[in-house]
């Protein structure tokens, strides 16, 4: 009996751990989880900050004055969206709203005027976060009104020019919340995404689910404990990036139909 006990390997538990009684692995996983959740919350909630970036205030002020001068007569009543939403350019209720790939909303006419103002040779930077705007999502249905048709035409023209630009990994991560929100919204809407794209998303989600429940892992939980879940989160994160890339390609291809 004694010989068997002496032959067994001895693994000290929590020796020299940062917090007594708590494994260092648990502490690392908890800290990384807080960082991941905090980053995700920042990406999702930063859209509520509608303050113009200091470097763009002069340009936005000039565009605002230009829009006010062009409106010699009061504009006719137009449908309003997001009753609690104010366009940061014209400081009025958002009408015919559009959303940029970074998740900020503007009046369609305001963001188009901001693009046309000055001598932009490429894609504009968001007036709020200064992220490069490569996609403009109209958030209204086309109507017979001339303003509506003009804004849709300008948005399509802008997307054709800049939606296919190369994107860095950080840009793709910053675009993730907006693209995923639009992708899943169209996925579950009638007449949204075509079936092949929906099938690809479902297969990707099933593949991620099988990987999460599979005992075969790059970092096995049985050996590394809670740290073994890091590869599962990493695979899921890569999957979300891949879905956003696919959706961007679908939006780009749709422009040339």
From Swiss-Prot:
- Pathways involved: Protein modification; protein ubiquitination
**Please, which domain of life does this record's source organism belong to?**
Eukaryota
> Record's InterPro entries?
DUF1232, RNF170, Znf-RING_euk, Znf_RING, Znf_RING/FYVE/PHD, Znf_RING_CS
Spell out the subcellular localization from the entry.
Answer: Endoplasmic reticulum membrane
Membrane-spanning ranges: 25-45, 201-221, 223-243
**One Gene Ontology MF term:** zinc ion binding
Enzyme Commission no: 2.3.2.27
What PROSITE patterns does the record point to?
Answer: ZF_RING_1, ZF_RING_2
What SUPFAM superfamilies does the record point to?
RING/U-box
| A cellular component term, taken from the record's GO annotations | endoplasmic reticulum membrane
The name this protein carries in UniProt is: E3 ubiquitin-protein ligase RNF170
> What organism does this protein naturally occur in?
Xenopus tropicalis (Western clawed frog)
């Amino acid at each position: 009996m004694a010989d068997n006990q002496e032959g067994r390997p001895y693994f000290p538990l929590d020796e020299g751990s940062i917090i007594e009684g708590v494994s260092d692995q648990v502490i690392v996983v908890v800290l990384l989880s807080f960082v991941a959740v905090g980053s995700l919350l920042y990406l999702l909630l930063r859209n509520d900050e509608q303050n113009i970036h200091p470097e763009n205030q002069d340009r936005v002020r000039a565009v605002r004055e230009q829009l006010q001068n062009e409106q010699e007569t009061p504009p006719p009543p137009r449908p309003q969206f997001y009753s609690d939403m104010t366009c940061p350019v014209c400081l009025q209720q958002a009408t015919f709203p559009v959303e940029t790939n970074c998740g900020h909303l503007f009046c369609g006419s305001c963001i188009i005027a901001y693009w046309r103002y000055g001598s932009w040779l490429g894609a504009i930077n968001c007036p709020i976060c200064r992220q490069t705007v490569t996609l403009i999502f109209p958030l209204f249905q086309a109507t017979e009104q001339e303003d509506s048709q003009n804004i849709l035409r300008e948005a399509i023209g802008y997307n054709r020019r800049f939606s296919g630009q190369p994107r860095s990994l950080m840009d793709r991560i910053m675009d993730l919340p907006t693209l995923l929100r639009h992708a899943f919204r169209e996925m579950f809407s009638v007449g949204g995404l075509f079936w092949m794209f929906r099938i690809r998303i479902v297969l990707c989600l099933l593949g991620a689910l099988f990987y999460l429940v599979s005992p075969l892992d790059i970092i096995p939980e049985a050996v590394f404990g809670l740290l073994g879940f890091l590869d599962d989160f990493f695979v899921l994160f890569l999957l979300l990036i891949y879905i956003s890339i696919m959706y961007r390609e679908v939006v780009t291809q749709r422009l040339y139909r």
